[in-house]
């Protein structure tokens, strides 16, 4: 991979550290405020979800219309300045309002930066190296995911929320610099022309028409969205692991094994060919991992099901994005990516809502999910 690809991977890692610092610090600080904090935390999380649903479709349009490099620089700079500003607030009431406001602004920024970040890859990485890039990026992000909670805990334990916000601002500024040194001339930027509100909705419609008529792309979105639905339900079940298995620390063990599975998956993903048949194979194998967790096996053997599941899900995710980045025309890439993100955000609360509707959480729920995944796989085949 070239130097620019390394810069983008570094930006992804830096942003991941900053986001985990921000979410951990804010959530712990709000939760420490008792009943009021619980209510505010709910508003904090819901505001992010709703904003993401509303902004994602527009983010794809902007990504296809304008310089993706400038979009990333702008969002990083805005978020960095915002975190820096609120880090100096000392009044708790003002801090609560500022955190909610900042969370909404960051959700808007991420709605624009996510599709731009995935789409710009095709401008700086050779087509045949995209799967390798995605695998390396996922490996770095998974390692950061394992290490960041410990780092976040130490920062909050020995410093304060204000220091957490300052560090988060620093990560945004570093990300800004990394993007600023990418090539200034993108491989393909649309001609500069007048851009109105009507054009936004026209572009969204054109993007949806493109997805509908490109059957292979439509199939990819269908598979990715359905997997997001099933695994949102799966993630809802995991916090109940201690009670389901009757083992203290089961949840932490399952998460640790899942992280190991993700890292291993990222290591081998670029060794596999990217094709529709491979995606369906990965999907059914991920389901096998879920199935293992529902079997009456010794606890730690059941826990290993999450290692299997995350191993194949990670490879699946890498190859889904590789397929999208290599098959979608550059003029539509941002809109296709934003559609994936929008559907993912939409399906997550639906899946979790269905799980709360169930009369009880039982081990059989894992088996039921595997049955659903297998049925979906059979229908696609």
How would you describe each model-predicted region?
Residues 119, 123, 161, 165, ...:
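Helix-loop junctions on the cytosolic side of multi-pass membrane transporters
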Residues 56-58, 65, 69-71, 75, ...:
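C-terminal transmembrane bundle of multi-pass solute transporters/carriers
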Residues 88-102, 294-306:
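Helix-loop junctions at membrane interfaces in 12-TM secondary transporters
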Residues 7-24, 44-61, 67-82, 98-156, ...:
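Substrate-agnostic recognition of the 12-TM MFS/MFS-like secondary transporter fold
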């Amino acid at each position: 991979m070239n130097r620019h690809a390394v810069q983008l991977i570094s930006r992804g890692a830096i942003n991941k550290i900053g986001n985990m610092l921000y979410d951990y610090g804010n959530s712990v600080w709000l939760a420490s405020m008792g009943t009021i904090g619980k209510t505010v935390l709910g508003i904090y999380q819901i505001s992010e979800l709703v904003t993401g649903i509303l902004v994602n479709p527009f983010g794809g349009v902007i990504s296809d219309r304008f310089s993706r490099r400038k979009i990333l620089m702008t969002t990083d700079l805005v978020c960095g300045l915002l975190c820096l500003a609120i880090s100096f607030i000392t009044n708790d009431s003002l801090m609560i309002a500022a955190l909610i406001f900042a969370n909404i602004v960051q959700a808007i920024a991420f709605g624009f930066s996510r599709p731009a970040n995935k789409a710009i890859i095709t401008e700086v990485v050779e087509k045949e190296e995209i799967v390798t890039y995605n695998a390396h990026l996922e490996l770095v992000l998974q390692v950061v995911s394992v290490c960041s909670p410990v780092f976040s805990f130490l920062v909050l334990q020995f410093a304060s929320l204000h220091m957490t916000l300052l560090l988060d601002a620093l990560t945004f500024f570093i990300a800004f610099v990394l993007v600023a040194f990418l090539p200034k001339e993108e491989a393909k930027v649309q001609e500069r022309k007048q851009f109105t509100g009507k054009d936004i909705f026209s572009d969204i419609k054109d993007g949806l028409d493109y997805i509908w008529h490109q059957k292979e792309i439509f199939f990819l979105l269908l598979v990715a969205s359905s997997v997001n639905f099933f695994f949102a339900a799966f993630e809802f079940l995991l916090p109940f692991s201690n009670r389901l298995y009757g083992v203290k620390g089961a949840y932490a063990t399952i998460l640790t094994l899942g992280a190991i599975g993700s890292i291993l998956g990222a290591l081998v993903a670029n060794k596999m060919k990217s094709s529709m048949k491979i995606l369906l194979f990965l999907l059914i194998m991920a389901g096998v991992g879920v199935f293992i967790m529902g079997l009456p096996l010794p606890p730690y053997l059941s826990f290993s099901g999450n290692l299997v599941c995350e191993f194949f899900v990670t490879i699946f995710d890498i190859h889904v994005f590789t397929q999208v980045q290599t098959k979608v025309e550059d003029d539509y890439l941002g809109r296709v990516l934003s559609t994936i993100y929008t559907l993912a955000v939409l399906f997550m609360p639906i899946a979790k809502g269905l799980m709360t509707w169930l009369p009880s959480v039982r081990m059989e729920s894992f088996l039921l999910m595997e049955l659903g995944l297998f049925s979906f796989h059979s229908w696609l085949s």
